[in-house]
């Protein structure tokens, strides 16, 4: 049996391609420091499932309701075109499309980011097809194009991607990243588009139809996206495999959520979305408000919940029970220390809609920094193990 386990690790690590990730200051932190966070929160309430459950009324619009940009904190470097033009992108399991700003973008935010110039690429092809992607924070409008995308030395030929002509809101000016590279299922992408990861697999550029994230909590660098394999040195113990419950997002069934031995949400089971595109733990209003009360978090005029930093060591873990296995998240993880204003709760409430058929939680970077995560497309499952 030990040999079988060893062979499994060797198989998972075969032909591994790694992409270093940089941890950057999130837009939330930038907005807070510029005293406009409350304005953002009032204009863009977080609603993770409403648009999908209510249906996509416009076939020419791709809805990405999970994405509100606010807490995206890990970025990687890709290039597009021949010769290559470089971009900082969020590698995001909560969306499926690739887009970057174009030189034709009229939004003020585009002036503060790298923009793609089609005139400089000999491999560029334009489709002429408009593209509109609705996020939690507004609409990205632009046009669809094709070009060579390079990621960690892998050359993805004729990749479809969006070029923005307009980006949502003045808040994007405070984003450190240029664009988004989605890693969710193709069913979430703009209609008919094959996502980057699917093209890498189809073109034989990776040896296995899976990828994995290691998000370091200790330093700016050290985080990693692994394509086509898994490096077992980044986790301890064995991977626990959980089936994807709905192959749209990377979604799984959660048995229970508890603190101090008592259920605080998900009493009859619920759904969890594993999302590298947010830093927070996000759930329905009532259980999240209950958590804020348990940890004695006080609502601030800035729209967030403040906690006395001296109490962190006394606060309980929150435990997510998934497929019979407990995944504790300690207070040191669910409370963040700000360089400016003390300590804040990393719990946030979704603007849930009464038509939603089930309770949904989003397990963001707070969770993923603790648990190495494998996204296995071949078997529609997620692997979890304690990160080292």
From Swiss-Prot:
Q: Which domain of life is it from?
A: Eukaryota
Annotated Peptidase A1 domain ranges read: 74-385
The listed locations are: Secreted
In short, the EC number is 3.4.23.1
Q: What cystine pairs are annotated? A: 105-110, 266-270, 309-343
GO: which molecular function terms? aspartic-type endopeptidase activity
Instruction: Note the SUPFAM superfamilies from the entry.
Output: Acid proteases
Query: Which GO BP terms, alphabetically?
Result: digestion; proteolysis
Propeptide boundaries = 16-58
Question: Per its UniProt record, what Pfam families does this chain match?
Answer: A1_Propeptide (PF07966), Asp (PF00026)
The region annotated as signal peptide is: 1-15
Q: Does the keyword Cytoplasm apply?
A: no
Q: Which GO terms describe its cellular component?
A: extracellular region
Catalyzed reactions: Preferential cleavage: hydrophobic, preferably aromatic, residues in P1 and P1' positions. Cleaves 1-Phe-|-Val-2, 4-Gln-|-His-5, 13-Glu-|-Ala-14, 14-Ala-|-Leu-15, 15-Leu-|-Tyr-16, 16-Tyr-|-Leu-17, 23-Gly-|-Phe-24, 24-Phe-|-Phe-25 and 25-Phe-|-Tyr-26 bonds in the B chain of insulin
What sort of enzyme, by top EC class, is this? hydrolase
UniProt entry keywords in alphabetical sequence: Aspartyl protease, Digestion, Disulfide bond, Hydrolase, Protease, Secreted, Signal, Zymogen
The portions of this protein that span the membrane are none
Record: active site? 92, 275
The question of whether Cell division is a record keyword is answered with no
- Which Gene3D superfamilies has this protein been placed in? 6.10.140.60, Acid Proteases
**What's this chain's function?**
Shows particularly broad specificity; although bonds involving phenylalanine and leucine are preferred, many others are also cleaved to some extent.
Q: Which family does it belong to?
A: Belongs to the peptidase A1 family.
Q: What protein name does the entry list?
A: Pepsin F
Query: Per the UniProt entry, what species is this protein from, by scientific name?
Result: Oryctolagus cuniculus (Rabbit)
